[in-house]
From Swiss-Prot:
Protein name per its UniProtKB record: Keratin-associated protein 19-8
Species this chain originates from: Homo sapiens
UniProt key word Ribosomal protein: no
Family according to the record: Belongs to the KRTAP type 19 family.
Keyword vocabulary terms for this entry: Keratin, Repeat
Pfam families reported in the protein's UniProt record: KRTAP
InterPro entries attached to this UniProt entry: KRTAP_type8/19/20/21/22, KRTAP_type_19
């Protein structure tokens, strides 16, 4: 299991995954970060990454 640091300017882009930040984009972007779903496809449906919170910093746990 690898962890990618998704904190970026307060929004938290979920980079990491396939092709750098292709699949990782939907995981940890805006309100989708707070909901904790999505991986790549606009943050809908898929749950292959989940953002975790540590002191306000988002970490995307890539499974």
């Amino acid at each position: 299991m690898s962890y990618y640091r998704s904190y970026y300017g307060g929004l938290g882009y979920g980079y990491g995954g396939f092709g750098g930040w292709g699949y990782g984009y939907g995981c940890g972007y805006g309100s989708f970060r707070r909901l904790g779903y999505g991986c790549g496809y606009g943050g809908y449906g898929f749950s292959c990454c989940r953002p975790l919170y540590y002191g306000g910093y988002g970490f995307s746990a890539f499974y």
